[in-house]
Regions:
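Reverse-transcribing Pol proteins
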Residues: 59-74, 280
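Electropositive polyanion-binding surfaces
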Residues: 3-7, 19-24, 36-39, 67-68, ...
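Extended, domain-scale alpha-helical bundle/helix-rich regions
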Residues: 3-64
Length: 334
């Protein structure tokens, strides 16, 4: 076996030792005699390297989820709940996302002066301390990998709750009026909506033609300017999407389009509205806060036109954000 592995060849007689090496690569074992005999460190990385060299593993095998004990997707048998909901199906609710996105978490709409932000209503289906709650706690969040997505919730529940999967979708809707960038007349309710799913590319084209999207875009631009005047700093650092397509790594630079800015700002507004509602109604919840950073005057004065080098340098000037039970300033968001 050692002779074979030294020459990067294997046969069926080596299967036992290869499985032992595989356990090290997956962090299921800390040591195997064969790696020591080969003078190779007993680490997951070196074991992985050897398995690739011998072609026992394909380069398409992703050991990291199992290595880090990340729970895989599982289907659970679920009884979906039905609750009384406010009918908002008369509104055109836009769910804007990447063209290859399979699930929609949020949507936006306009009803006269009232803005609505709709969020997939997952919480209705998850009872505290239930099997489903435990499932989600083990995973904490969705994990987006180049070759797969590991969901926080069972895929069948994610599909059920995703907006736009059927003619009518269940949502938690946050409605409010915004005048001179001040939020008032907040309503939060469980709703039923009709969703129009759009890619960012299609939304960019529709911004000038669709009155609802055009009004929402103008609103978010005003709100962004309001935050900037109150000290907000957003660094436009490059982002990329890394995916595995047709057994090849595909890297695409995310373009900063009008519709991406629109959706991002609407989510900032949603956080502000919910925080204000919770404070006004004395509802206990976690608040994300951040103290004022230590930025130079040059960065503050030129924050809209920073070079890439200046932007990367500025990342070191932010104070660490904190989650607290008390509402307070988030300096980075203004």
């Amino acid at each position: 076996c050692v002779d074979n592995l030294q020459n990067n060849i294997v046969d069926e007689r080596d299967s036992f030792w290869l499985r032992e090496i595989e356990k090290v690569a997956l962090n299921q074992s800390k040591h195997t005699k064969v790696l020591s005999a080969l003078a190779i460190d007993n680490t997951p990385e070196r074991a992985h390297e050897l398995l690739l060299k011998t072609k026992y593993w394909s380069e398409l095998i992703n050991p990291y989820p199992e290595r880090h004990k990340i729970y895989p997707n599982e289907e659970l048998t679920l009884d979906f709940k039905e609750v009384t909901r406010e009918d908002l199906t008369h509104l055109k609710s836009f769910a804007i996302d990447n063209s290859d996105s399979s699930e929609a978490d949020d949507a936006i709409s306009l009803d006269g002066e009232r803005v609505w932000i709709h969020i997939a209503d997952v919480a209705t289906q998850v009872d505290i301390d239930s099997e489903l709650d435990g499932y989600a706690q083990k995973r904490a969040s969705n994990l987006y990998l180049p070759d797969q997505t590991i969901h926080m919730l069972p895929p069948n529940l994610s599909s059920f709750c995703s907006l736009g999967e059927s003619k009518k979708s269940s949502a938690l809707s946050v409605g409010f009026k915004i005048i001179d960038c001040q939020i008032n007349d907040i309503k939060i309710l469980q709703s039923e909506i009709e969703v129009v799913k759009m890619s960012y590319e299609d939304a960019d084209k529709a911004l000038k033609e669709d009155q609802v999207l055009s009004k929402l875009n103008n609103l978010t631009k005003s709100h962004k300017a309001f935050r900037n005047n109150n000290g907000a700093i957003k660094l436009d650092l490059p982002n990329v999407d890394v995916k595995l397509k047709n057994k090849k790594v595909d890297i695409q630079i995310q373009t900063e389009s009008e519709s991406r800015k629109l959706v991002a700002e609407m989510m900032v507004i949603a956080g502000r509205v919910i925080a204000q509602y919770a404070t006004e109604h004395k509802i206990s919840m976690p608040f994300l806060t951040q103290e004022v950073g230590s930025f130079s005057e040059d960065i503050i004065q030129n924050k809209e036109n920073l070079t890439a080098t200046q932007a990367f340098q500025a990342t070191r000037c932010f104070k660490q954000s904190k989650i607290t039970p008390k509402a307070s300033l988030h300096a980075g968001l203004g």
